[in-house]
């Protein structure tokens, strides 16, 4: 059985809403255990991540980056980095913001760099951008 952690911060419920959809999708994969974990809880005990095979990160985009609470979680993993405890695990991320641009890509890049610092393997999105499927550019979803 593979273990997957969805680590997220949600101040107003929007990121949590997306996290629950990610949870449902991941649980549809046979032989996969998926846990939804708040970033603020992991900041106190980041060692809880070590049994997982993959980590999906979720944060709102605030002023072009992850939320302060999510950054606190990221910073708390310093010891795991020194031990290379997350090396070789899978990583992915998602974000939400209230504006069409809002620099969501910067937030996803922060998660990507965090994963690379830990030696994780980033899992990208296998879908073409929506504008290639006929969706108007102003309605298309930003993807990394």
Region locations from a protein language model:
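Aromatic-flanked redox-active Cys/Sec active sites in thiol-based oxidoreductases
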Residues: 8-12
């Amino acid at each position: 059985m593979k273990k997957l952690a969805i680590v997220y911060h949600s101040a107003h419920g929007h990121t949590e809403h997306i996290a629950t959809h990610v949870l449902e999708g991941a649980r549809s994969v046979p032989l996969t255990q998926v846990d939804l974990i708040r970033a603020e809880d992991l900041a106190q005990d980041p060692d809880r991540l070590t049994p997982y095979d993959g980590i999906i990160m979720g944060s709102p985009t605030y002023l072009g980056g992850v939320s302060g609470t999510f950054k606190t979680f990221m910073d708390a993993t310093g010891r795991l980095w020194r031990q290379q405890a997350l090396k070789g695990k899978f990583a992915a991320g998602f974000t939400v913001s209230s504006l069409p641009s809002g620099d969501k890509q910067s937030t996803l890049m922060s998660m990507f760099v965090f994963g690379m610092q830990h030696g994780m393997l980033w899992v990208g999105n296998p879908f073409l951008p929506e504008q290639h499927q006929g969706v108007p550019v102003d309605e298309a979803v930003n993807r990394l």
